[in-house]
């Protein structure tokens, strides 16, 4: 989220407004069952799309921190908690050596075929 945004920051209101717009979209595209978010938000469970860890982690963090800091309406807390619980339930794995891994992390993203990406889903 907006981190530690000083009260006297000249663009504070603008940044908080943007965060609220983003939060609305994040809430809209949260997967109802898992609480996570898909790699391509607006494509849902379409073939080839998947519930992705890094965006889900950042979204849950932004919502919860935004509420805690007072940048977001408290209604977003429920969405953030659902995302956090989804991460714990679906994406965290304990390895044989006792370490913890976050699974389903996207290393590279892009749309289109090889060798050039044209922005299409295929």
Could you say what each language-model-derived stretch is?
Residues 48-55, 60-122:
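CBM-like carbohydrate-recognition segments
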Residues 2-20, 27, 66-82:
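Structural helix-adjacent loops and short alpha-helical linkers that scaffold large soluble proteins
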Residues 1, 7, 11-15, 30, ...:
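Solvent-exposed loop and edge beta-strand segments that line ligand/cofactor-binding
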